[in-house]
């Protein structure tokens, strides 16, 4: 049998069909009130911020925008803001990802962010898309800029 330091795991050897022994691990029982090292215990788990209509914050802290895309339009425009999504007209055909690339370019211009900070998260082949913003910004700022752009049309 193997001898291990106290406090690790207990190992038991059970016979195998081939004649060799197989080791089984069993966790040692925890003491009442014992805490694990390095982990803080909070009473309530951290919750993401409630969504502000189509703009929300994901668990990693990135701002996300729900988009309803309308590819093949004459010009790029934010046409409407609803509780579910931001309606965006895109002046690119919906083929080979052209409309997705144009959507990210247009949103980066409207939101005054770098193109690399606006990433398509979900909906590559759908009109319902989720765009993730990698830049540090607040949902309120994003919603304000989108409303401002929607009023132009």
From Swiss-Prot:
Listed SMART domains: DUF167 (SM01152)
A Pfam family the protein falls into: DUF167
GO cellular component, one term: cytoplasm
Basic residues composition bias: residue spans: 1-12
KW ATP-binding (keyword) present: no
In-chain residues carrying the UniProt-annotated modification Phosphoserine: 116
InterPro entries linked to this entry: DUF167 (IPR003746), YggU-like_sf (IPR036591)
Keywords attached to this entry: Phosphoprotein
Span list, region Disordered: 1-55
Coiled-coil residues: none
Assigned protein family: Belongs to the UPF0235 family.
Name this protein carries in UniProt: UPF0235 protein C15orf40
Organism: Homo sapiens
Gene label: C15orf40
């Amino acid at each position: 049998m193997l001898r291990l330091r106290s406090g690790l795991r207990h190992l038991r050897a059970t016979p195998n069909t081939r004649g060799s022994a197989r080791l089984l691990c069993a966790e040692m029982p925890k003491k009442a009130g014992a805490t694990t090292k390095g982990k803080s215990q909070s009473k309530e788990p951290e919750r993401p911020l409630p969504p502000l209509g189509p703009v929300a914050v994901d668990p990693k802290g990135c701002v996300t925008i729900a988009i309803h895309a309308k590819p093949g339009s004459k010009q790029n425009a934010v046409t409407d803001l609803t509780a579910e999504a931001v309606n965006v007209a895109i002046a690119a055909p919906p083929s080979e990802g052209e409309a997705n690339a144009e959507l990210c370019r247009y949103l980066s211009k409207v939101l005054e962010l770098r193109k690399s900070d606006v990433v398509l998260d979900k909906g590559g082949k759908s009109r319902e898309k989720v765009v993730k913003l990698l830049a540090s910004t607040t949902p309120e700022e994003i919603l304000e800029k989108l409303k401002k752009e929607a009023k132009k049309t």
